[in-house]
């Protein structure tokens, strides 16, 4: 068996019976012959299957529920999008079940939460945050419609994607920094996840477009404040003095700004996502606004459309066009190279 919690489908396959018969054994065993009941019960014991009482109650009550998986709970952007999604889905008459995902080594959301929500027989699943682009997701979802928000994935048969145009977003960042006289622009990356890879690639292309390929420098960090702080602190300790830091997201930028402050060094800093903290006066971070309101509304509508028209031919990917919010953090006069 794969390294995951066995499902009623696994029990049925192991026992050589239908899923409905397994359900009947669990709900009303007196209606099943002793021979077939014993076969199902043996499979349940061998596989270690535990009936999901919540799922059975959902099915029995015919409730309309949608599961929302949240990754990177430390990032306010995820919560901002989730709140808009909740409002939209509840207004459409659905219950919303939230699940907090475990992030492994910065790789993004795994499949365990998707599997658990599918077992609950939800009508659809919406994932907020970076998600691995792997075939295992399709297996975990089964036939459940799903929308991935802010993800580096491509839409598949029963999925759709709502994301930010990172190519334009990082283009705006580099254009702004170059226009301010910065040529040595270091990218503080978001780690090894799919969104981090997209933004790093966009940084490379934007630098090349400005004829700055020789000035390209990437510092491996991560999506958290601590990761940004440690990466920039190590960069400065090595004796390097970048004119500007284009960071993966706002939290990473906050950490970068802290490292610069502690070292007594000035450099232009930009973030990405424009979370509410970025506008505070003492921070005043220049950031790419990914419009969490529009993204949340668009992703909820996309999921509802996918649920109602699973075989329909329509655009299964929407991209929000970002804008750059310029604040004091990027207005630092560049040092001479």
Regions found by a protein language model. Give the residues of each.
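Alpha-helical recognition/docking segments in bacterial nutrient-uptake
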Residues: 1-3, 61, 65-175, 236
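Short acidic/polar active-site loop segments enriched in Thr and Asp
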Residues: 18, 64, 123, 182-185, ...
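Generic beta-sheet signal
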Residues: 35, 147-151, 164, 270-272, ...
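Flexible loop/turn connectors
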Residues: 237-244, 248-337
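N-terminal helix-turn-helix DNA-binding module of bacterial transcription factors
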Residues: 1-64, 334
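Glycine-rich phosphate-binding loop signature in dinucleotide/nucleotide-binding domains
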Residues: 47, 119-121, 180-181, 235-241
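Hydrophobic structural packing positions in well-ordered secondary structure
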Residues: 11, 22, 40, 66, ...
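Hinge/beta->alpha junction and helix N-cap segments in small-molecule ligand-binding domains
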Residues: 53, 71-80, 99-108, 162-172, ...
């Amino acid at each position: 068996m794969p390294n995951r919690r066995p499902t009623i489908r696994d029990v049925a396959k192991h026992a050589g019976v239908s899923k409905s018969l397994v359900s009947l054994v669990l709900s009303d065993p007196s209606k099943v012959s002793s021979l077939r009941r014993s076969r199902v019960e043996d499979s349940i014991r061998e596989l270690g299957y535990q009936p999901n009482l919540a799922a059975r109650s959902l099915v029995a009550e015919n409730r309309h529920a949608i599961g929302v998986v949240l990754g990177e709970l430390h990032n306010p952007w995820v919560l901002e999008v989730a709140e808009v999604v909740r409002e939209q889905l509840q207004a459409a008459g659905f219950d919303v079940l939230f699940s907090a995902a475990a992030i492994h080594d910065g790789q993004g959301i795994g499949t365990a939460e998707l599997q658990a929500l599918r077992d609950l027989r939800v009508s659809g699943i919406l994932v907020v945050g970076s998600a691995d682009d792997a075939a295992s997701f399709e297996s975990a979802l089964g036939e459940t419609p799903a929308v991935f928000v802010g993800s580096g994935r491509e839409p598949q048969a029963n999925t759709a994607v709502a994301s930010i145009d990172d190519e334009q977003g990082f283009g705006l960042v580099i254009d702004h920094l170059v226009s301010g006289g910065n040529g040595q622009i270091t990218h503080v990356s978001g780690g090894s996840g799919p969104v981090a890879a997209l933004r790093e690639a966009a940084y490379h292309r934007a630098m090349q477009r400005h004829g700055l390929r020789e000035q390209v420098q990437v510092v491996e960090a991560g999506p958290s404040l601590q990761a940004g702080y440690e990466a920039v602190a190590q960069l400065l300790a090595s004796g390097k003095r970048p004119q500007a830091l284009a960071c993966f997201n706002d939290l990473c930028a906050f950490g970068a700004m802290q490292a610069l402050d502690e070292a007594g060094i000035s450099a232009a800093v930009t973030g990405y996502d424009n979370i509410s903290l970025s506008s505070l006066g003492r921070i005043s971070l220049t950031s790419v606004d990914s419009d969490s309101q529009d993204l949340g509304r668009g992703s909820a509508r996309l999921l509802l459309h996918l649920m109602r028209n699973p075989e329909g031919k329509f655009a299964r990917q929407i991209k929000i066009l970002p804008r750059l919010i310029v604040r004091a953090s990027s207005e630092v006069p560049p040092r001479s190279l």
